[in-house]
């Protein structure tokens, strides 16, 4: 059994409509559902202390997650959350399975940008937990400076500078991982060549691995994320709960 914490509307004891389906499915599975208002730093409906508690909702900053963790004991600790949510928590562990990159403060990132531009003519720039959308792909130092200015990136903010890899048209897949067990939508299997990466990430309870394929058909890990704040992408909510959350509840019991 689990307690599931979902986002409420700001200043309201009502689930955010974007998470209504998850609330319905979670309750249908017999889980206790609580609501968290990040704006007020308020938790509605205290979780049952006899059960582990899992957050499912919008991305939280380190401070916001700590605030939630202070209100109730969470299955995923703040340290574990950040280790999956931020690139500096996972990149070094799986360098052989993901495109090359460098994590560096924005004020000192010019060298890394120049290096990757010389390598392939383009590079990918993102924050350690979020991309800049279509603007993340740049082809010059001037574009990099414009990106920093537009998004008001401070010189001390960490950036993830990555080589640009041409990918095939095959759709990217999101795998939810519970400990070392990876689950794909519609019974998709994690490629064998990427399974050793799960061993390098084994200290995490619940995370996601996004897999894409190069133009030569090689599978690569594009991103690791915390499973609590990851969108379901090609999954249905029902499948997520029947497979992934069910397994998580079994192991956490």
Cite the ranges covered by each PLM segment.
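Active-site nucleotide/adenylate-binding loops and adjacent lid/helix of ATP-dependent enzymes
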Residues: 3-17, 46-48, 56-173, 177-195
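Glycine-rich, highly charged phosphate/nucleotide-binding loops
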Residues: 35-44, 59-61
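A long amphipathic alpha-helix within ATP-dependent nucleotide-binding catalytic cores
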Residues: 158-164, 170, 176-225, 229-252
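Short, charged N-terminal beta->alpha structural module
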Residues: 2-39
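Hydrophobic, Leu/Ile/Phe/Ala-enriched alpha-helical segments that form helix-helix packing faces
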Residues: 22-30, 72, 94, 120, ...
């Amino acid at each position: 059994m689990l307690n599931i914490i979902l986002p409420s509307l700001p200043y309201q004891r009502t689930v955010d409509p974007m998470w209504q389906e998850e609330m319905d499915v979670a309750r249908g599975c017999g889980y206790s559902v609580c609501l968290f208002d990040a704006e007020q730093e308020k938790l509605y409906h205290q979780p049952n202390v006899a059960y582990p508690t899992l957050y499912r909702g919008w991305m939280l900053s380190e401070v916001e997650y700590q605030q939630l963790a202070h209100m109730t004991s969470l299955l995923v600790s703040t340290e574990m959350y950040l280790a999956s949510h931020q690139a500096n928590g996972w990149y070094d562990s799986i360098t052989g399975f993901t495109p090359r990159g460098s994590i560096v403060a924005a004020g000192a990132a010019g060298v890394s940008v120049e290096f990757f531009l010389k390598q392939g003519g383009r590079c990918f720039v993102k924050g350690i937990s979020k991309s800049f959308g279509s603007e993340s792909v740049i082809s010059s130092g001037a574009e990099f400076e414009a990106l920093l200015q537009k998004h008001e990136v401070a010189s001390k903010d960490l950036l993830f500078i990555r080589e640009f890899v041409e990918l095939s048209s095959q759709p990217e897949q999101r795998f939810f991982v519970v400990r070392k067990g990876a689950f794909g939508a519609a019974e998709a299997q994690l490629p064998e060549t990427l399974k050793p990466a799960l061993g390098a990430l084994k200290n995490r309870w619940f995370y996601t691995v996004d897999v894409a394929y190069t133009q030569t058909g090689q599978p690569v890990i594009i991103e690791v994320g915390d499973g609590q704040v990851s969108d379901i992408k090609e999954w249905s909510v029902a499948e997520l709960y029947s497979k992934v959350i069910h397994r998580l509840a079994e192991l956490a019991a």
